[in-house]
Amino acid sequence: MSEAVGGVYPQVDLSGGSSRFPEMEENVLSYWKKDDTFQASIDQRDGAEDYVFYDGPPFANGLPHYGHLLTGYVKDIVPRYQTMRGYRVPRVFGWDTHGLPAELEAEKQLGIKDKGEIEAMGLAKFNEYCATSVLQYTKEWEEYVTRQARWVDFENGYKTMDLSFMESVIWAFKELYDKGLIYQGFRVLPYSWAEHTPLSNQETRLDDSYKLRQDPTLTVTFPVTGVVEGSSANAGLVGALALAWTTTPWTLPSNLALAVNPAVTYALVEVAEDGEAEFVGKRVLLAKDLVGSYAKELGAEAVIVSEHPGSELVGLTYEPIFGYFRDHANGFQILGAEYVTTEDGTGIVHQAPAFGEDDMNTCNAAGIEPVIPVDIDGKFTGLVPEYQGQLVFDANKDIIKDLKAAGRVVRHQTIEHSYPHSWRSGEPLIYMALPSWFVNVTEIRDRMVEVNQDIEWMPAHIRDGQFGKWLEGARDWNISRSRYWGSPIPAWVSDNDEYPRVDVYGSLDELEADFGVRPKSLHRPDIDELTRPNPDDPTGKSTMRRVTDVLDVWFDSGSMPFAQVHYPFENKEWFDTHAPADFIVEYIGQTRGWFYLLHVLSTALFDRPAFKKVVAHGIVLGDDGLKMSKSKGNYPNVNEVFDRDGSDAMRWFLMSSPILRGGNLIVTEKGIREGVRQAQLPMWNAYSFLQLYTSKNATWSVDSTDVLDRYILAKLHDLVAETQAALDGTDIAKACDLVRNFCDALTNWYVRRSRDRFWAGDEAHPEAFNTLYTVLETLTRVAAPLLPMTTEVIWRGLTGERSVHLTDFPSAESFPADADLVRTMDEIRGVCSAASSVRKAHKLRNRLPLPGLTVALPDSARLADFASIIRDEVNVKNVDLTSDVDSVGTFEVVVNAKVAGPRLGKDVQRVIKAVKAGNYTREGDVVVADGIELNEGEFTERLVAANPDSTAQIDGVDGLVVLDMEVTEELEAEGWAADAIRGLQDARKNSGFEVSDRISVVVSVPEDKKEWITTHADHIAAEVLATSFEIVTDALDGETHDIVAGVTAKVTKN
């Protein structure tokens, strides 16, 4: 037992006297705010090279969630680290303010149900409301982000609805238009009838866009009636019934053609007596490969009358399934289309060109114009009077009923399939031909693929996998939205088709030059009010009017890198020299969202990537492994976690997980609390230990010759070097692993093995105090980005200086490297851990000494100088070292047939025989048996030892330990005395004594333990600082303390 001194540390106390991390964090946040530490971290790097980081702007009309929390931590760690590495890292917050998310929230708050109500209210009032409601939760966001200890500039943040931002957006539009990369077209697009607007293809690939939905499927007949004049179709097929299958019966009233694959073989089949009664004896046409799929309807005895290549069907005409468009030019014929397959259906595809992209392309080639009997509400128009006013999905029931009555239905089923829904309203989409403006992405697709090779992706496989494949299949981007609140499409067109003209504007100056007024707003309705006479109309009667659509909100998001700095109107040189960004991060779904559209616009506008490095993290899941849901309550409340465990605990839990390597993460309270134990507590405990025993200021020193000091300093060298490499590579999870492992070595080995030196005091062993101070001062700088508030408390407590976040990241060169010592000492730790596992398995307490430990390790002689450490740590009397590992035990490979079998097939038995015969080799995680490779998981290892119960493997090396567990009475007595010391220490503590107080002890023991305590009395007294130690066998009067079983004691302060 030693005297505690203390009083030197903390130099500055940010703990407020509390040992609870959440309370310390509140003190740190208050200090940072008062001190303006964040701004100081920027200012001190004035003149340094900028590190450019793009912060994907969130919407402020909803509260933040765990996804924002996770991404926010990464967005804080990387800039903090890069600042410590000498860069200037401005961090400006931005707000996404336009588009459907904003409009739908405003509609919800206003009780608006459709666009008519918006127009009745007036665009100006509606958009004014959107501008306010979209920032509804900015205060909550600021509080949330600040509580995260995330440093970001809110005061100078940008909003996508700012005039400066929007001017840069219309500049981008005009640039693309002038490059021929924007065009107006009529295409089949995903259309949200609930929100009255088309969507882009990538929006239908966002999370939650595809949902399971039950829909009817129909196989219907199309009677062949003739041959198109001049075609080579087989006239012998007239009278047959062509069968077509559809999952969208509501499109059948718009049918204008059928499509077959000219290279596929089709069969003319006569329906047998046991087939569908209504069609018995009739001849039907379908792909030969799919005849078996219709065995029930065609009958078991159905006969294939003849076979025909699809080319013989091209040019046949047929009876329309409905009569609405009977006279439509070039309609109701069978066309050839290579996209038709025999994977499902009948091999004959019904064509409704207004509602299918392939249908439109096929019909356009045949001169068949689409018909669109559906309005903006997704309801049938008067073109199909029987179903007028019905939502198309609701009309399915009546359409099927009418077709059955007409004898046209061969099969009617219901399927459950994944179907696209609006990412905002959740209603099912329809695909419908609409006029729209497009970015010609296909024109730059190959270049986008090339430019992607210059980006460093984490995880790396995304570059050529999920993102690369998406780029290879990229399609033109529909950027029109038939809505109100957004950046305008800056195109003005003539209102008279006889005098066509299109003007596109890319700046306020250009608008002012043509319209004679400088816009104060680019929002509707202000921008719509700018009109002028058409210069190309000699009559002067036509007017140039802006197209009413606004831009896809993702166009805003993709413009963020340059629009946030009002490029090219301001900051042109800065942006041109600071793009691409050094780093961005969002969740993996943004490979089809923000990451993708940043890439599209940067490639199109600047012929370069938008970012150099990107982290695409996984998804945060609830504690049941499912998506987080408020109604299910399957995740811990964020604020409760902050109040109970602190933000640093949450940060550590999220950042140390596989989620930053692309995996998903289940959030549990237990996992968060485990994070506290991995790094925060060890760090704090080591700091508290230094506080407790220091009597004078320690100094920063790496000169100690003590082996434990040399070891921890060498470990510190490795920690600094490896953590720097990890964070340079943005491998935050690895950095956390490194810090966690170092903290384990620091507290569970270095501090514990050095206790005697610390107890002796800093006069006797200044090198121990200086080393621990140096280690803690350096460790807090290394871990500062990972645990910003915990490290701030400790670092300021140690140094008294302004902030750990204003320091430089340590240099590994400042510390002595000693790879051999680290390797040897880590092996010793492994030896002790293995021995401890055997002891624990046999329920032998640590204070009970045991006879000996055998350590079998290749080249074990190098551990000889450290045998005393092993002996003391494991609490054994003798340590025997041997290099003959096989004499102690071996590991046999056992084939896991269930895992290996599916891959190896019949060879698995051959492998099992070879392994049993010892005919195998092993290198790392791979075993080769009889020439066949077994991968990790396809085999296990089994220890074969002379004394398996007392033998354990040394983790990380090819070695074993054998613990001699034979306990003699002498050893039992010694262990009992150690237990008594512990009991008396507890009695001191419970009595409220100071660590340095001297005491008197009267101890009552059973007669059978009197000899044991008498033998060890001097040792016990010395350990508990007892100047008087009396042994009795009678019961004690007054207040006593239970020491060990059957033993009580009275302790009094001298």
Curated annotation (Swiss-Prot):
A motif ('KMSKS' region) lies at residues 627-631. This is Isoleucine--tRNA ligase. It holds the Pfam family DUF5915. Belongs to the class-I aminoacyl-tRNA synthetase family. IleS type 2 subfamily. It catalyses: tRNA(Ile) + L-isoleucine + ATP = L-isoleucyl-tRNA(Ile) + AMP + diphosphate. One of its GO terms (molecular function) is zinc ion binding. One of its GO terms (cellular component) is cytoplasm. NCBIfam families: ileS. Residues 523-539 have a biased composition (Basic and acidic residues). GO terms for biological process: isoleucyl-tRNA aminoacylation. Keywords: Aminoacyl-tRNA synthetase, ATP-binding, Cytoplasm, Ligase, Metal-binding, Nucleotide-binding, Protein biosynthesis, Zinc. ATP binds at K630. InterPro entries: aa-tRNA-synth_I_CS, aa-tRNA-synth_Ia, Anticodon_Ile_ABEc, Ile-tRNA-ligase, Ile-tRNA-ligase_type2, M/V/L/I-tRNA-synth_anticd-bd, Rossmann-like_a/b/a_fold, tRNAsynth_Ia_anticodon-bd.
